[in-house]
Amino acid sequence: ANEQIMRQYLNRVRQYSFTVRVEEEIEELLKAGESARIQAVAAGLNMSSRTLQRRLEGERTIFMQLVDKHRKQLAHDALAHTERSITEIAYTIGFSDPSNFSRTCARWFGCSPAAYRRRIRQLPT
């Protein structure tokens, strides 16, 4: 019984570690202003994109959700803590078009990037 529990625990740790490695690679690419496409992330982890996708599926994780999560965090940080233009932020975090960024911000934050910036800066720190 203890051996089985240990195996289950180790499997969970391995799965968690893989997702974390993928997220770290995504974050590195986005922070460098590069596109976090699955091919680039897979190459950074020395595997094919199909293997990366299969391993994430095994953990019930979807690649684009990980990218979306990190883009959202970077957008929040840039809007809250920098004076960079909305357009510059959009391109920096991997959007091909500022209007796509605006639509995505509406989904993430419920308003435009400019409105979110005003709102977040009015909050007490």
Predicted regions, residues:
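Extended mid-to-C-terminal alpha-helical interaction segments
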Residues: 1-125
